[in-house]
């Protein structure tokens, strides 16, 4: 069987959608090397990519069509047909119309535009709604990254339940490496980080609720604590900078921008734990990553986050600053928590075992 993939996010996206694409592709190569894989991408996204690994490049078809957007919408069909693809997988909420002999799979990561409409301009909401509904309609199989996303899709698109398969994302191989004292010391020095800190990973945006996390850090009981945010900015980054300046938090809040993806597991290991008070997630990969590192996680009691965290997380009302603050205090000073969390985390992450999740994905491909 020859399986094709949309390579835009794989080559061009540094965050969640890109990580999902790269991890899935690498795991398929690891567990199912007997199958053939092809990545289709426009040179606009390929040319300056930092992800030109031999395993990807050797299996990539690069288009030099005049318009990258038009090629992804229509021109890619011809390229896919020419390369003997049996199944084509759109990895991020879109899939092209293809000849009937080529089966189509699409991964839908979330429907944020539907659940939190005020965080999107009207035109964007209409476009995302159209693309999502169309992708679910023309695909032979729809991959939802969580049960929550599956239910959201049924509500929004009326897609038959039997057409939607829940296949959880998993962690990449970097999370399986040990992180010893010497390595941690190297990274404390490299980035000038405080010796103890809680970690945030994600955009500085309204949906991610970062400003409330800053408010929690500014409460009197947290004046001795530090926050490290691994983030490349977002729609509230300016407001966050202003708040940090006004409240004189510069010495306690640190941003790590453009952190190489392979260094992130080390930062998790260095932290006291993850604080992830998002208002909505289709999945919430940082929760899984932190649990894989055996770290305490504070996250929201909304959408998919309880599904991912199970009984291994501390759940809070993300709109309650005092609740966020109390949870930070708890993981900072409760030394007995570490061993308990590690035990629960190791149990919870088995739900997302890489081999099991990759097998579920391959089962979908082979069923078509």
Locate each region found by the language model.
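Carbohydrate transferase catalytic cores enriched for Leloir-type hexosyltransferases
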Residues: 1-368
């Amino acid at each position: 069987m020859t399986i094709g993939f949309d390579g835009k996010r794989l080559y061009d996206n540094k965050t969640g959608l890109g990580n999902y694409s790269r991890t899935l592709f690498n795991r398929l190569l690891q567990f199912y090397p007997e199958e053939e894989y092809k990545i289709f991408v426009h040179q606009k996204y390929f040319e300056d990519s930092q992800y030109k690994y031999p395993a990807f490049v050797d299996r990539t078809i690069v288009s030099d069509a005049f318009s990258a957007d038009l090629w992804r919408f229509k021109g890619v069909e011809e390229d896919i047909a020419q390369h003997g693809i049996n199944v084509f997988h759109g990895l991020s909420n879109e899939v092209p119309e293809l000849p009937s002999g080529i089966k189509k799979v699409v991964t839908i990561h979330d429907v944020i535009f539907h659940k939190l409409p005020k965080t999107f301009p009207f035109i964007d909401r209409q476009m995302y709604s159209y693309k999502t509904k169309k992708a679910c309609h023309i695909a032979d199989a729809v991959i939802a990254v969580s049960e929550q996303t599956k239910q959201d899709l049924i509500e929004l698109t009326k897609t038959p339940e039997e057409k939607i398969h829940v296949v959880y994302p998993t962690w990449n191989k970097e999370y399986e490496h040990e992180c010893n004292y010497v390595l941690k010391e190297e990274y404390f020095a490299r980035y000038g980080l405080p010796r103890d800190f809680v970690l945030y990973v994600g955009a500085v945006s309204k949906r991610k609720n970062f400003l409330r996390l800053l408010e929690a850090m500014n409460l009197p009981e947290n004046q001795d604590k530090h926050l490290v945010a691994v983030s490349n900015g977002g729609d509230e980054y300016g407001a966050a900078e202003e708040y940090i300046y006004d409240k004189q938090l510069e010495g306690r809040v640190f941003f790590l921008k453009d952190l190489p993806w392979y260094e992130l597991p080390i930062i998790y290991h260095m932290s006291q734990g993850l604080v992830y008070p998002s208002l909505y997630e289709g999945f919430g990969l940082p929760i899984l990553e932190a649990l894989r590192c055996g770290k305490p996680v504070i996250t929201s009691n909304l959408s998919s986050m309880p599904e991912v965290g199970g009984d291994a997380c501390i759940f809070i009302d993300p709109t309650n600053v005092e609740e966020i603050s109390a949870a930070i205090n708890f993981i900072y000073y409760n030394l007995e928590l570490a061993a308990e969390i590690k035990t629960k985390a190791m149990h919870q992450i088995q739900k997302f075992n890489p081999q099991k999740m990759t097998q579920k994905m391959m089962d979908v491909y082979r069923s078509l």
